[in-house]
Amino acid sequence: MEIIRSNFKCNLHKVYQAIEEADFFAIDGEFSGISDGPSVSALTNGFDTPEERYQKLKKHSMDFLLFQFGLCTFKYDYTDSKYITKSFNFYVFPKPFNRSPPDVKFVCQSSSIDFLASQGFDFNKVFRNGIPYLNQEEERQLREQYDEKRSQANGAGALSYVSPNTSKCPVTIPEDQKKFIDQVVEKIEDLLQSEENKNLDLEPCTGFQRKLIYQTLSWKYPKGIHVETLETEKKERYIVISKVDEEERKRREQQKHAKEQEELNDAVGFSRVIHAIANSGKLVIGHNMLLDVMHTVHQFYCPLPADLSEFKEMTTCVFPRLLDTKLMASTQPFKDIINNTSLAELEKRLKETPFSPPKVESAEGFPSYDTASEQLHEAGYDAYITGLCFISMANYLGSFLSPPKIHVSARSKLIEPFFNKLFLMRVMDIPYLNLEGPDLQPKRDHVLHVTFPKEWKTSDLYQLFSAFGNIQISWIDDTSAFVSLSQPEQVKIAVNTSKYAESYRIQTYAEYVGRKQEEKQIKRKWTEDSWKEADSKRLNPQCIPYALQNHYYRNNSFTAPSTVGKRNLSPSQEEAGLEDGVSGEISDTELEQTDSCAEPLSEGRKKAKKLKRMKKELSPAVSISKNSPATLFEVPDTW
């Protein structure tokens, strides 16, 4: 079902009903772009840590707009052993509300827009008919503005507004506005004396003049009239004054208040759908869904927090249960029988043995999708086939039980190992971001960090490390990359061999991480200095500590290419006999648990968060024997 601004309100109850009835949901988003700076390959480096990947996406992807949101609800019919689906395709756009903030600024990426256009995407449905939305802070501010306007209109008679120059008006009226206000009062007196006229339309005026009119009339005519602001076709605002008795005045005030509340709800718009999904606490399915989740939280709840641990806490408060089908398909027992985990190819593979396509049917009044037509990159369709993929894989897990189970529900313990783990694209040794605990910390003692001239290509790096057999290269930027060797003991040899190189520099991954942490500490210490000290240092550059200057230039420069050129890193006999590097295990550290999301979340989400923690404390730990088939479905701690 296609939902735009014009039919959103009349179909909202259908959306709520579908969410309430569903066993689980599948979601998908389409964006105005992916990266505003680095290329996608640089944005997704193969040796990113989860924190680094989060920071990259937060910095380079959140200024784009999620402008199409697909939602497909799935409800299992036990009588006919089939799923009933309801698909929704929402077009979303941050339309400015009633001249009030926020006036959202966003960016577009030409390649993304061109791609969507080639897929038949209708951008008019976004920019002309998109459903508005507000995050929770924007909604709070807008409601406060309305309350303030009402208090100004209804409470102008307070003594604090009495002018020392007049005993007739409790408002201080500027000299240049007194004539204007006197003319308005005179017109109202004529209206009250007239037996024929019931209404008076004033000329369009400024917001400040309207405020003076409201305050003056509220004090001078506490009864007998009703004052309302309307708007012309040209978007000019004017005031209408009507003669009414007290009962009619109260009725109109109540009517006006109800209209304002309705306008506020309209401004909140699509965010109400996200709130309903979140408050349901049900399982939300996505495919490669990290970016979808980040945009959803950022756009419809609150800006993303500064660090990953806070993001994890916030996300699990909003969506208690998430499942990523790309991670699921990349994990045993699926990994060995699914070669391609892209959504389109995964959907095709799961129709073949040993899998069985699920039996599904669209609910009455909802259009059905034909997977043969492949309406890819329509968010509603992508959400639909994401749900189908989940059902097929979940049911396949049921075949390992004794006796086999044909239908595995969204509440089954078989799929719990996949909860709240989001697939990390193109990371070689950390397959997922763990929202409910510490992330994996793989040993990277076989990885080197290499800096080199910007003229170098991938072939130059392969030539440099040709003596070390198979290598993997992950570019960081134009002048640096990670190089993964096949054997950890080769790292020491490569570093020692390159000590006197002029055009490139090699360090171990541990050294690279250590220096980055040192730079962060220096930067943090610098920012914590007083403004006075910082200003004095700006005035006198010689005051900058020598150690800081030396550290910066030592870590951020290398000799330009010389006539010596590149050389092959062939190890000598002496270097080959050097002792191996230390291969100690990196211990896992517990992530800090914060309440950073408590304030921007609703009371319902706070309660859900509390119940989830209680459940963790009260639920007995379930131990599964290593010989049990269930161990096949554990998301591994190592990759």
Swiss-Prot record:
Family statement: Belongs to the CAF1 family.
Main enzyme class: hydrolase
Subcellular location: Nucleus; Cytoplasm; Nucleus, Nucleolus
Name under which the protein is recorded: Poly(A)-specific ribonuclease PARN
Region named Disordered: 563-611
Assembly mode: Homodimer. Found in a mRNA decay complex with RENT1, RENT2 and RENT3B. Interacts with KHSRP. Interacts with CELF1/CUGBP1. Interacts with ZC3HAV1 in an RNA-independent manner. Interacts with DHX36.
Protein EC: 3.1.13.4
Keywords linked to the UniProt accession: Acetylation, Cytoplasm, Exonuclease, Hydrolase, Magnesium, Metal-binding, Nonsense-mediated mRNA decay, Nuclease, Nucleus, Phosphoprotein, RNA-binding
Keyword Phosphoprotein annotated: yes
Annotated residues for binding of a divalent metal cation: D28, E30, D292, D382
Residue list for modification N6-acetyllysine: K220, K499
Interaction with poly(A) (site feature) positions: K326
Domain of life: Eukaryota
GO cellular component: cytoplasm; nucleolus
GO biological process, one term: miRNA catabolic process
